[in-house]
Swiss-Prot record:
Subcellular location field: Virion membrane; Host membrane; Host Golgi apparatus, Host trans-Golgi network
Organism: Human herpesvirus 7 (strain JI) (HHV-7)
Residue intervals annotated with topology Intravirion: 69-86
Membrane topology term: Single-pass type I membrane protein
Family to which the UniProt record says this protein belongs: Belongs to the herpesviridae glycoprotein N family.
Protein name, entry field: Envelope glycoprotein N
Amino acid sequence: MTLYKIVSKPIILLAFFFTRVVFTNEVDGEELFYKPTCHSDTYEIILKKFSSIWILVNTFILLCSFSLFLKYWCFKTLAKETVKGY
């Protein structure tokens, strides 16, 4: 077995796979988008998906860390200003 035969089989399989992929421009609900009843400026939040739960957890962690930082920073500034007078 030559190196060409070993390497060429996966490459041929990948080429076959990528040439068989069909790309479409269809979007779900596209026919309703241009109708007057469509409200494209509203977005329905679905909390059943993993990504939406994950972003809520990340937002909560970010807000908690930001509040702890501000609490520390304000306490540090208050203590520094209080001690400065003595």
